[in-house]
Amino acid sequence: MPNPWTGIGNPYTKQEVVDRLKATLAKGEPIIAAGAGTGISAKFIEKGGADLIIIYNSGRFRMMGHGSTCGLMAYGDANAIAMEIGEYEVLPVVKEIPVVCGVHATDPRRRMWHWLQQVKNMGFSGVNNFPTHCIVDGHFRGVLEETGMSVKKEFEMVGLATKMDMFSIVYVATPEEAVEMVKNGADAVIAHVGTTVGGSIG
């Protein structure tokens, strides 16, 4: 059912989002999930016929004219930025398609169960694991794993979202990560092949 308070739009249940996506596939059409960094972007993403809108902190940096990799750096509170874009820009203007919130699952300052409740109460219909540590490798990846900022936190976040009846569309970089995400209830799995390129900066 749509929003029980207004009769239309977000938040949707996990199954409602899945059913919408299955309906798209049944028509032989690809699923399109587009990132929005501003309200005006979200408006035209919806008008263009996308299936999902995803909000992540990197969208804010893109709107500033910077590359999406900024979203992986310590240039701001990734969770707060995504929430702010959703609350003040995107959720107020989107009429009907599901909106997904990027969640930085390894943020040690947040009780993730508590944060996800806030995400859901804000009106988001699902979550995405961004910024993601799955695309970090080498020595720094090892340091993250050793110091409690493991990609396992992202699996756990998706598991919590599943318990809260929230849809999840997730990034992975290996088959093993894909398996773990599915075990935790992920609904859609994206093979992350690198950050955005092209345009003026990427």
What positions do the PLM features span?
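Alpha/beta enzyme core
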Residues: 2-202
